[in-house]
Amino acid sequence: MDFISWDSYPSVDASSGQMALNHELMRGLKQGKPFVLMEQTPSVTNWQPYNELKRPGIMRLWSYQAVAHGADAVMFFQMRRSIGACEKYHGAVIDHAGHENTRVFRELATLGQELDKIGERTLGTREMAECAIVFD
């Protein structure tokens, strides 16, 4: 396959092992080459049984976990929170407040700066697995 991406929306109590397995599955589909984390929410989802706001730092942790497992890009949905339909309850980089003076925006800005600094060392990296898991 030329391009592999996936959307990661774990619950706030998700196991880091399950998340790692999902990233590894995507990397495996690309023969060990990097994949793209196409969507994750910077704050809350609108469809979990409990839509808790992510604790400070958790979005950064999960983003670095994706990079450590082979993601060349870590993206977020959505940029600006919707004003209608069900996605008005889904988190966004810019909340209904309409400005960047929020914890979520500041955390994302910091994450972007950090990833920019390490990008030359992480983009395109490959990791050869020492074991295999049959996933059927």
What residues fall within each predicted segment?
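Carbohydrate-binding surfaces of carbohydrate-active enzymes
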Residues: 2-136
